[in-house]
């Protein structure tokens, strides 16, 4: 089980990303629009830099829904390999069959 503080921190980051998503997207569009004057684009970059760092989507860490483990994460299942194997062995994941040869 992951530390609760790490899981909670990740939840706070997700909340911030959602809160600032529209503003960040608008500023990025202005900053990357080459038809605008250089000064205006630079202003947009400065405003973008003033936003909280944790409002960037790249700061979100994918974590297992079951244990909170940050590594070996399967995006499709939203869980780590350890949880997948454990739940699969107990037959709790539909369609997952243990291989044997």
Swiss-Prot record:
This is Small ribosomal subunit protein uS14. It comes from Phenylobacterium zucineum (strain HLK1). Binds 16S rRNA, required for the assembly of 30S particles and may also be responsible for determining the conformation of the 16S rRNA at the A site. Part of the 30S ribosomal subunit. Contacts proteins S3 and S10. NCBIfam families: PRK08881.1. GO terms for cellular component: cytoplasm; small ribosomal subunit. Transmembrane segments: none annotated. Keywords: Ribonucleoprotein, Ribosomal protein, RNA-binding, rRNA-binding. One of its GO terms (biological process) is translation. It holds the Pfam family Ribosomal_S14. GO terms for molecular function: rRNA binding; structural constituent of ribosome. Belongs to the universal ribosomal protein uS14 family. Signal peptide: none annotated.
């Amino acid at each position: 089980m992951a530390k609760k503080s790490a899981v909670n921190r990740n939840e706070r980051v997700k909340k911030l990303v959602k809160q600032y998503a529209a503003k960040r997207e608008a500023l990025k569009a202005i900053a990357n629009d080459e038809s605008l004057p250089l000064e205006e684009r630079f202003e947009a970059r400065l405003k973008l830099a003033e936003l909280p760092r944790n409002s960037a989507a790249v700061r979100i860490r994918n974590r297992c829904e079951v244990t909170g483990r940050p590594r070996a994460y399967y995006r499709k299942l939203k869980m780590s390999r350890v949880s997948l194997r454990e739940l699969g062995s107990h037959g709790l994941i539909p369609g997952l069959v243990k291989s044997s040869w």
